[in-house]
């Protein structure tokens, strides 16, 4: 059946034939919702003006942009758009350039938006405030061990990392962003290890976490699922806790800009913790490892 010049409707909608001319006619149409020209907003990369009906953490977690939000944060508007849950001009991969000082050393950090509302409604004391998970684009500090010796006794909560190193980052991040912008939330952290129990990491390894505890957290290092979307070398389900899903940024950006490994919370055995390797692999290493090729890459919740 010939279709050239077929015109099914009086207003030319659905016109078939002469594609060059007809595409220009269709493309010239304005799609307007709530006073916003959607075609202009999308083709111009201006996501923020799109109507509020599609502004949410769920929608914005599915878009990677990579825009510098430093001035936006300093203006105070970013915190307003987080607090109301619209995240109106905040997308995954957007970032804030903000140096932090840790134990007397200042690090210039590009803090990327890694996820929106990751911990919302989680915790024994429910997290009800909207938030953005901020995660450095690179490993911040190298030559930092998880423990002084090759032991995982006490789980992650009993580690030197949690007891000594993380508090230094809490101080540095609160000083840089303002304490009111750092959301305290609740996480399950492992606290006991049975050195004789089989590790879920396999390979005949011994040492498995056996308990956890709800803990106030301002700053932390990631779990395995936050990076990979699943447990890999974790010794048991206790290593996952309430950090059981992948951060949105790792669905788009599966690398560290500086190619340095970083520690993860999971106990792998009686002497090892999990790491995200600088070669792009899920891995593990001795708890006392202190080396220039890796270290600490902490996250916090911005409000």
PLM features: residue spans?
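Collagenous Gly-X-Y triple-helix signature in extracellular proteins
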Residues: 46-303
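Intrinsic low-complexity, repeat-rich intrinsically disordered segments enriched
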Residues: 1-50
